[in-house]
Amino acid sequence: DKISSDPSLEVLAESSILIDTKTGNRLFEQNADRQHPIASISKLMAALVFVDNNPGWDTVYTFRVSDERPGAKSNVRPGEQISARDLFYDALVASDNAAIISLVNLTGLTEEQFVDKMNQRAVSMGLVETVFNDPTGLSTGNVSTAAEVAVFARQAFLQPDIREAVLTKSYELTLL
């Protein structure tokens, strides 16, 4: 059953959607097809693309100055070494922008190629209002709708590695 308006449900968000995670059916929506910048929600699509191109969870990465991005302070410093798994958790638990860039570098793709794969993945899911300009979500050009975010978030949560990381409340990084 779809609930399209319920006076007892007060939603303060400009756009929202509630879906049945098993069926994908919309249970409630409010301006769910209106496009907005999605900020760090972009990291879910980046995580999907990384999982598809993962060189191995134990792959060691040396953090670079060029990985640093504006936003929250990174948990890793230039020259420090860290596993792909720890970078993945840093990106999804702490929403570390630099960790996402490091994961991009670990795939061997350029940032532009990685973003192209994010957009290709969106198209393959039938998402027509979702566009990515960068993997971190710092770009206001990363846009989607609540309805389309629900689609790719659902796909992300079907991946055990992504689901586990996103549901983790805290994570201790190990520098190598």
PLM segments and residue spans:
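Conserved active-site loop region of the serine DD-peptidase/beta-lactamase
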Residues: 158-176
